[in-house]
A protein has these predicted regions:
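Hydrophobic regular secondary-structure detector
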Residues: 1-172
Length: 172
């Protein structure tokens, strides 16, 4: 239930941030596309779905959507510049690619060492570290391969609408 709640909140925040249902759909699609292969690799490694692996997935659910959000936000910026969806997706993905890759491998380097802890705690954290690292890696694969492609076909050209009135009031 915690995984579903985290996913629903992540999608809601994306919708509020991007204010575009199509872009939210692309970002929301990234979540299952990263989690399903994670479950497959967990099965190959002999892991079960337990409290530790679900905790790991619950912690990284925001990260799983984050890579796609970064890509989509940059694509939306290019769309507001008047580019076609295909052109915006390709140029935005090229612009932001290295940053997304660097962020992902930084997160992997944070989570993966927990898989190599020794002792009693290490027995529990093996599945935690591997599950988090694998999920974050598949998030990168989805963000770099599928998000730009889906954006090129699903998003529509748009003009900049500016900030919502309540944000302008808040910022002064």
């Amino acid at each position: 239930a915690l995984l579903y709640e985290g996913a629903a909140l992540a999608v809601l925040v994306v919708l509020l941030f991007l204010r575009n249902a199509r872009a939210t759909f692309v970002a929301a699609t990234a979540l299952p596309l990263a989690v399903i292969p994670t479950f497959m690799v967990m099965h190959l490694m002999g892991f079960t779905i337990n409290v530790v692996t679900l905790l790991s997935l619950s912690l990284v659910v925001g990260v799983l959507v984050d890579d796609a959000i970064v890509e989509i936000e940059n694509i939306m910026r290019h769309l507001e510049m008047g580019k076609t969806p295909y052109q915006a997706a390709m140029e935005a993905a090229d612009e932001i690619g290295l940053a997304v890759i660097a962020t992902t491998f930084t997160l992997i380097s944070v989570f993966l060492p927990t898989a190599f802890m020794v002792g009693v705690a290490g027995k529990f954290f093996v599945q935690f570290g591997w599950t988090a690292a694998i999920a974050v890696f598949f998030s990168l694969v989805v963000a770099r391969m599928l998000t730009p492609m889906m954006s090129a076909y699903i998003l529509k050209p748009r003009v900049s609408r500016g900030l919502p009135r309540w944000i302008e009031i808040y910022l002064g």
